[in-house]
Amino acid sequence: MPYLFAHFREKLTPDGEQIHLAVSKNGYDFTAVNGSKPVITCDKGEMGCRDIDVIRLKDNSFVFIATDLCIVNRMDENHNVNWADISSNGSKFISLWRSDDLVHFTPQELKYFGRDDFGCIWAPEIFYDETADDYIIHFSATVKADNFQKMAIYYTKTKDFENFTYPKLFFEKECGVFDSHLVKIDGTYHLFYKTSAKPLMNMHETSKDLFGTWQHDFDFQNYMASLYRPGSHEAATTYILPDGKWCLMLDFFGCEKEKMGYVPFISEKAGDAHFHQVNQLFSFPYGFKHGKVIEISDEEYEKILSFFNNKAGYASLRAD
């Protein structure tokens, strides 16, 4: 069963904060495409993107979305970043692209959800709600009401990625929360997120109702607390491996820049959030930063490899 891993790279040049792709035949060993160069390069907004998400729509086409943000372009001469300014004076748009075949992409679009009080919109992710036949985009944001002090998870609904409902609060805690990942398995919704304090780490909650009460997973919290530098993991994404095991990827940034990227955890059964770290079972050509893994067909896998491998000197796309 092949997989596509959409992600960005942490570099000191803007070409890292663009859309990069990798593929895998087995879900464990990933190969970069396009010579490890971007497949899509932003030409609007902040001229870069982070927190890449991709979903296969009902019509079998694809939508990519990402945070409209280029950290490199906001660094000072010493490579320092003012995160308080970025979270209170950031972009109020997300970036969006469409694709029918994962090798050709529409031009970048900036999508606005209609709220001027947001200080930023980070880590957007698409979840298909089959009960309402809606695509839900949930994302992290700060708001003016508390002087942009606490991040929470908001959501908007769409059916066509052109028209969006007014964003509402989806999930919050006493401290800030961000980097939400939402998946439904066997009738249970699983929400992964990261807290900003007390404690600073990734969390997991479950619910039988998407907009109902969430049950905190203390076993998951205790395991996360046992990790080396637990506060240096973020950006959860999950997928089911061909053998039925559940893979959780967490983006680790508690090291030098060239070693930053996703580290894998496995549970023996999809929906059972008792994970253990298994770095030795996976291989990556470089550090993959905040992204998304989806299943693709054998034909799509071969087409991606053939297209990009046969494009000598292929430049990342700004538009078809």
Feature roles, as predicted:
Residues 1-320:
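Carbohydrate-active catalytic/glycan-binding domains of CAZyme proteins
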